[in-house]
Every structure is written in C-alpha cells, then in structure tokens.
Regions:
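Nucleic-acid substrate recognition interfaces
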Residues: 1-145
Length: 145
C-alpha cells in the first residue's frame, strides 16, 4: 500500500469548498444523531446502524454514497479512538476561527481517473499527475485542503 499526494488545480477550489461544507454537514448530523441515540438508549450507534438514517443523503448533498459511508465509518472510528460520546462540530464558516479544513473522503467506486482528470460524482477535477496515477489501483482516499 502506498500513499500518493496529488495536487488538484486551483480552478476547482470553489467546488471543493462546497463539497467540504456538505461533508461537514453530514458529519455534524451523524454526530448529533449518535449523541441523541446514546442519551435515549444508552448504546452507541455503529456505522451500520446509522446507514438507514443517512439513506438518500447523497442525492440531497451532491456527495457520492460511498463518501457518506466513509464519513460514518470515520466518525465511529474517531469516537472510539478518543473515547467521547460526542465529537467536536465541523465548522464551514470561512470567517470562523475554528473553521475545519476541507476534507472529502472517497472510496474506489466513487472515483474515476482518466488522462489527468479525476471524476468524483458528476464533477471532473484536473490534477497534476506526477506519479502516473494510471499505474496504481486507488482503493480509498480523500481530498484534503
């Protein structure tokens, strides 16, 4: 397994910011849902249990369904890692001092690569391919600011 860091061209910055804002919205929803369920029942939600509550979110938010799955899985992993009932909110406001940097996770089925372009959902992003991405098999990853 190898980690590749590729740079996406700057002209896609606004679209990536919008997608990162949607990711923050889903993260905050899952965080709130999990905490309310814990208070009500005394049990933690697993990523699988949350799936029925986030069903259809990909159509509303413009994110790929595998991205929603990755957000849920990452949330549960971090909640267990830090042993917290509720994690911090992810803030999208650019003027906020506590603004969360852009993070858009994806899985293999949510991403397509062809000739220096990465297609995520219905959006194409140009990138500088210094590694020759076509030689590698991408399984998971994320767009990070």
């Amino acid at each position: 397994m190898k980690t590749l860091k590729l740079r996406i061209k700057d002209k896609h910055c606004k679209m990536l910011d919008q997608l990162a804002s949607e990711v923050n919205f889903v993260w905050n929803y899952v965080n709130d849902l999990s905490f309310k369920h814990l208070k009500r029942t005394g049990h933690f939600f697993s990523a699988f249990d949350m799936a029925k509550y986030t069903k259809g979110t990909s159509k509303l938010c413009g994110l790929h369904s595998q991205t929603i799955d990755a957000i849920r899985e990452e949330f549960v992993t971090r909640r267990i890692q830090f042993k917290k009932a509720k994690l911090k909110w992810r803030v999208s406001n650019k003027k906020s001092a506590r603004r969360s940097l852009g993070w858009i996770p994806f899985k293999k089925s949510g991403l397509k690569y062809a000739d220096g372009w990465v297609e995520y959902g219905k959006t194409k992003f140009g990138l500088w391919d210094s590694y020759g991405l076509s030689k590698y098999s991408v399984r998971t990853g994320s767009f990070v600011k």
